Amino acid sequence: MEKRSNKYYLTLSLKEYANGETQPAKELGIEFDNHDEIFGIIERIKEKKLFADDSEAVQFAIGLKLFSEIKIKNRKNPLFDELNEVFPVFMKKLKSL
């Protein structure tokens, strides 16, 4: 039986370069699946007040969920060898806060 997952579409837009320029504008959109409901995770991370502001909490939650889903799908990839031991410890710590 195939596991069901949530389907997402994420848009990333470059609004301003470090030098203050706004052109050329850049934007990309990606479709992806994730086994978690990411909006709920964002709210839980924000409620924990782990970061200076809600924007950082949102960035952390989105980055973590994108990264962790790829890591799960590619767990046998040698790139993740060192993380396979410590990442579950990190996730347990995060969930316990």
Label each PLM-derived region with a short phrase:
Residues 2-54, 74, 78-97:
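N-terminal intrinsically disordered, cationic/polar leader segments
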Residues 56-63:
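Short, well-ordered alpha-helical segments
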